[in-house]
Amino acid sequence: MQHGLLKPSFVQRIDFIDEQIAELEAEVEKQNAPMEEAVSLLAEIPGFDRTTAWSVIAEIGVDMSQFPSADDLASWAGVCPGNNESAGKRLSGKTRKGSRWLRQKLCQSAWCASRCKNSYFTAYFQRIAAHRGKKRAIVAVSHSLLVVCYYMLQRKCHFQDLGVNYFDQLNHEKLTRYFVKRLTRLGHKVTLQPCPAAA
């Protein structure tokens, strides 16, 4: 039998599989109709789409009262580093065992979120990756994404991005004090006057 004769058969199989996928997705939509609000909310998160939202909800549900806090949810899911510390030093950064499927979906979303322009998650990823490497940064972003899911589902609120400049704004006063102190030690008298553009 010639290979050319096999091609139509493969095309038919692919078409059949595509039809089955479409039917399954339609069925998932139907089953998730009562949770449509929650799915739509989570789909607003950078790195998420509706399929990811379905996957997360399938694992954690929509009732966050089952978890005392966002950290409890993250611990249950296995997306927060172990807290083994001695004299203030972390002994282990390994994540705890949790839902492998959920952790996988969150890590995929974390990679996507870390590449979104003007997003808090991009800044957060870069901040952690610079000191602890990309793998730990992805776990940190995954944890942050799940915490966001927790509060959005708990409060039924829309996503609000803190922005790519969040950490700069957070540390603005701290950095100002630091540089004033350094300049003073170097023998300079420092008088601060905000620039009109920064005021």
Model-identified regions with their sequence ranges:
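A detector of single, family-specific signature residues
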Residues: 1-199
